[in-house]
Amino acid sequence: MEIKPSRIFSTITIFFLCLLLAHVTSKASSSSLCNGSVAECSSMVETEEMSVIMESWSSQRLTEEQAHKLSYGALRRNQPACDGGKRGESYSTQCLPPPSNPYSRGCSKHYRCGRDS
């Protein structure tokens, strides 16, 4: 069974038009909640905007506070933060990441190194 591309396009177009219609009607119904004066409606909108700002601010503060806390696993005794290495080595030797671009290139003829001259 073969479906024509024009049929798929029309189906997708109808679907998005339905979504657009639902979005527009929901916006229209939410904006028609205020039946008072312009001042009353504007103060109601400002209050709603302020509550959204306050919610985002408080959630941002909570995430910032949680980012600075240590986990209980980090507080265990005799547990190095990294692999630790051999006995007698400092714990921090294994914490360094491997070099991102180690030098592994040879000497080309262009540079006329001592061995190629």
Curated annotation (Swiss-Prot):
Main location: secreted
Record localization: Secreted
Keywords: Disulfide bond, Glycoprotein, Hormone, Secreted, Signal
Record-level GO BP terms: calcium-mediated signaling; cell-cell signaling; regulation of growth
MF GO annotations: hormone activity
Signal peptide range in chain numbering: 1-26
Site positions (Required for proteolytic cleavage): 60-61
Disulfide bonds, paired cysteine numbers: 82-95, 107-113
Keyword GTP-binding in record: no
Region (Disordered) residue spans: 77-107
Cell wall biogenesis/degradation keyword on record: no
Post-translational modifications: Proteolytically cleaved, probably by S1P, a subtilisin-like serine protease (subtilase).
Glycosylation sites: 35
One cellular component term from this protein's GO annotations in UniProt: apoplast
UniProt similarity note: Belongs to the plant rapid alkalinization factor (RALF) family.
Name the record gives this protein: Protein RALF-like 32
